[in-house]
Swiss-Prot record:
Catalytic activity, EC: 2.4.2.7
Pfam families xrefs: Pribosyltran (PF00156)
Entries under HAMAP family matching the protein: Aden_phosphoribosyltr
An MF annotation (GO) of this entry: AMP binding
Name of this chain's protein: Adenine phosphoribosyltransferase
Taxonomic placement: Bacteria, Bacillati, Bacillota, Bacilli, Bacillales
Source organism of this protein record: Listeria welshimeri serovar 6b (strain ATCC 35897 / DSM 20650 / CCUG 15529 / CIP 8149 / NCTC 11857 / SLCC 5334 / V8)
Length: 173
């Protein structure tokens, strides 16, 4: 398998979650063990190069990407969730979506100062989610060593919010 083959495992869904949005569905990739392992292995290789201490992923597809990477590396995973979903003290950050606004939260003790962090998510669109996640990590004293995505929607220019941050993007659609 090659990186270019991963595009065969992304389903295009028009008008979801609302009219005018073209959703990129990664569940076909997750349903295929070889494709899922290949994508995960590419991110693991990237994380090893960066000497990552912990993986951070935003709800929910960031979990799907980040948890197997953390497992493969033998390191922890820190979830970033919507407000009210984490049971202990949290910090919050507001962000813009491709189709609205929301907030993200993270346990206030999830990252130790100086930890090298890899942020994982399935998709880089407008960059709002990743920008908020970066701010949460940095507020806790973490060092964002890199960001890894399965897909970038290049026309939405989310990469502009990642200036100065290393990144791995497996597919551009």
């Amino acid at each position: 398998m090659e990186i270019k083959d991963l595009q065969d495992y992304v389903a295009i869904v028009n008008d979801w979650p609302k009219k005018g949005i073209v959703f990129k569905d990664i569940t076909p990739l997750m349903n295929d063990g070889e494709a899922y392992r290949f994508a995960t292995d590419k991110i693991v290789e990237y994380a090893k190069e960066l000497k990552i201490d912990i993986i951070v992923g935003p709800e929910a597809r960031g979990f799907i990407i980040g948890c197997p990477v953390a497992y493969a590396l033998g390191i922890g995973f820190a979830p970033v969730r919507k407000p009210g979903k984490l049971p202990r003290e949290t910090i919050e950050m507001e962000y813009d979506l491709e189709y609205g606004t929301n907030k993200l939260s993270m346990h206030s003790d999830a990252i130790k100062p100086g930890q090298r962090v890899l942020i994982t998510d399935d998709l880089l669109a407008t960059g709002g989610t990743i920008e908020a996640t970066i701010k949460l990590v940095e507020e806790l004293g973490g060092i964002v060593a890199g960001c890894a995505f399965l897909i970038e929607l290049k026309e939405l220019e989310g990469h502009k919010k990642l200036n100065g941050y290393d990144r791995l993007i497996l597919m551009q659609l």
